[in-house]
């Protein structure tokens, strides 16, 4: 089964997302999928809170004149804006945009709050719905008209040095987040023609899907003083002078969820990282006639023991065990514990890992400690496999001064190996003309194993 078909199929079978809503590019997070989303964004919120960010919530509606205030910024997506033009039957004097992103909204309010250097730094974030009128082929959780989980952070600083330090913090923070959810990535500095509109520069996180295409999963933008000058974000410096703040912004969306689903899944279904799994352990009682009560009593005891540390589900449905195994493998539950009469007699239980399929017999009297060890191994294995997967999709090619020869070499590598092709960095081919020659996207300038490369790939 091709990846595209597998992806659409697993969203339905595993109860992640239902795209049958009657608006293109809009769908519904189902309960199981929503829990994956919730646990993932809890990790992200914790990382932000621990680094001095404050969560907030801004309006969804943006007046047209406010959105248009930063001309270069709005040009980047003016064809994708949804507009509210009426209140009931009454035409509005000023059209209202459904939030495509929140720079203009937040910076209007920051002007009210920032007066002196002691008001800085200001580090805010929100997790909200955003709207883009996508005209391309929409894909669930990947390319949406309503992005249902957009975490955007916006910061303001007194100096360029503080602003640069914030970029480093954001990159480290996002790296830690993707490590936690076991999504591998490379970081690139986007080329000038592909940076965020209005930014000095953009750093981006990309991962690689099983079909060899890359997915942008996070961006970090250094805005310099560009937006501050437009929105008059001035403050009084310690020596009494006036200056504009320096700003950053950075975002992560539903693509993080799409990626953790896509990167580790297999022919059986999902393979979910432990920390974001709605159910971390599923208990399967093996019932035999005359032994039902003994088994159920013991497995309920086990359920109570494990629930002190893990999210556990006891599957006591009246169906065959094989059907239960299949159902929970589709949903990617990390560990399955089977318990039957013989296990009880022997003082044992059987643990099955979703990531490797390995079956491990453990002593029941020591089961909590054994589960903790296996969970730790599961986490480590998923991280190792994530790194291996992205390395297997990276190809370094030798530089050719002949642009046409180099482009043919890159196209051949993309065809044969897919993934990301790394070209030793050279200004002569770091341009849109080369991008057209290779019929792929220049992701940007990437450091890999201590060397600078131009990274190129076919993208979603």
UniProtKB/Swiss-Prot annotation:
Protein EC: 6.1.1.15
Localization terms from the record: Cytoplasm
Membrane-spanning segments: none
The processes (GO biological process) annotated in the record are: prolyl-tRNA aminoacylation
Q: Determine if Phosphoprotein is one of this entry's keywords.
A: no
The protein's annotated catalytic reaction(s) are: tRNA(Pro) + L-proline + ATP = L-prolyl-tRNA(Pro) + AMP + diphosphate
Which cellular component terms (GO) are annotated to the entry? aminoacyl-tRNA synthetase multienzyme complex; cytoplasm
- Class of the enzyme per the UniProt entry, highest EC level: ligase
Q: Which UniProt keywords apply?
A: Aminoacyl-tRNA synthetase, ATP-binding, Cytoplasm, Ligase, Nucleotide-binding, Protein biosynthesis
GO molecular function (one): proline-tRNA ligase activity
Q: What does this protein do?
A: Catalyzes the attachment of proline to tRNA(Pro) in a two-step reaction: proline is first activated by ATP to form Pro-AMP and then transferred to the acceptor end of tRNA(Pro).
What is the similarity comment for this entry? Answer: Belongs to the class-II aminoacyl-tRNA synthetase family. ProS type 3 subfamily.
Can you state the subunit structure given in the record? Homodimer.
Q: Which HAMAP family match?
A: Pro_tRNA_synth_type3
Per the record, what about its domains? Consists of three domains: the N-terminal catalytic domain, the anticodon-binding domain and the C-terminal extension.
Q: Which protein, by its recorded name, is this?
A: Proline--tRNA ligase
């Amino acid at each position: 089964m091709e990846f595209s078909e597998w992806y659409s199929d697993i969203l339905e079978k595993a109860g992640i997302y239902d795209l049958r809503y009657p608006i293109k590019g809009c769908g519904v997070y189902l309960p199981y999928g929503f829990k994956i989303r919730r646990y993932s964004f809890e990790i992200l919120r914790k990382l932000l809170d621990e680094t001095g960010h404050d969560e907030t919530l801004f309006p969804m509606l943006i007046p047209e004149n406010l959105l248009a205030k930063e001309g270069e910024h709005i040009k980047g997506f003016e064809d994708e804006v949804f507009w509210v033009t009426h209140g009931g039957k009454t035409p509005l004097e000023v059209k209202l945009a459904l939030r495509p992103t929140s720079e203009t909204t937040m910076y209007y309010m920051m002007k009210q709050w920032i007066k002196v250097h002691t008001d800085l730094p200001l580090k805010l974030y929100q997790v909200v719905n955003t709207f883009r009128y996508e005209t391309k082929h929409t894909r669930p959780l990947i390319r949406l008209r309503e992005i249902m989980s957009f975490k955007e952070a916006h910061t303001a600083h007194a100096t360029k040095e503080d602003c640069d330090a914030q970029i480093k913090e954001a990159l480290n923070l996002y790296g830690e987040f993707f490590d936690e959810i076991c999504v591998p990535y490379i970081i690139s500095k986007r080329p000038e023609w592909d940076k965020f509109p209005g930014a000095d520069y953009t750093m981006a996180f990309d991962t690689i899907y099983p079909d060899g295409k890359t997915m942008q999963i996070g961006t970090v933008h250094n805005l310099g003083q560009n937006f501050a000058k437009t929105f008059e974000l001035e403050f009084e410096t310690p020596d009494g002078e006036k200056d504009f703040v320096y700003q950053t912004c950075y975002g992560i969306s539903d693509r993080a969820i799409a990626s953790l689903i896509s990167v580790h899944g297999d022919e059986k279904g999902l393979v979910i990282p432990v920390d974001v799994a709605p159910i971390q352990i599923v208990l399967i009682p093996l019932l035999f006639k005359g032994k039902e009560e003994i088994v159920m009593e013991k497995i309920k005891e086990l359920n109570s023991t494990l629930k002190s540390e893990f999210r556990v589900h006891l599957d006591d449905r009246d169906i065959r065990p094989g059907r239960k195994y299949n159902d929970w493998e589709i949903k990617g539950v990390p560990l399955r514990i089977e318990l039957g009469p013989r296990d009880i007699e022997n003082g044992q239980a059987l643990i099955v890992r979703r990531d490797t399929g390995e079956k491990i017999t453990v002593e029941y009297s020591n089961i909590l400690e054994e589960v903790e060890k296996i969970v730790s191994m599961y986490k480590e294995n998923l991280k190792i496999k994530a790194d291996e997967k992205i390395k297997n999709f990276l190809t370094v090619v030798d530089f050719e001064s002949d642009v046409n020869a180099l482009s043919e070499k890159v196209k051949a590598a993309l065809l044969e190996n897919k993934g990301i092709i790394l070209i030793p960095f050279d200004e002569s081919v770091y341009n849109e003309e080369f991008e057209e020659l290779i019929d792929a996207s220049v992701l940007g300038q990437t450091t890999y194993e201590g060397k600078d490369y131009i990274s190129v790939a076919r993208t979603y």
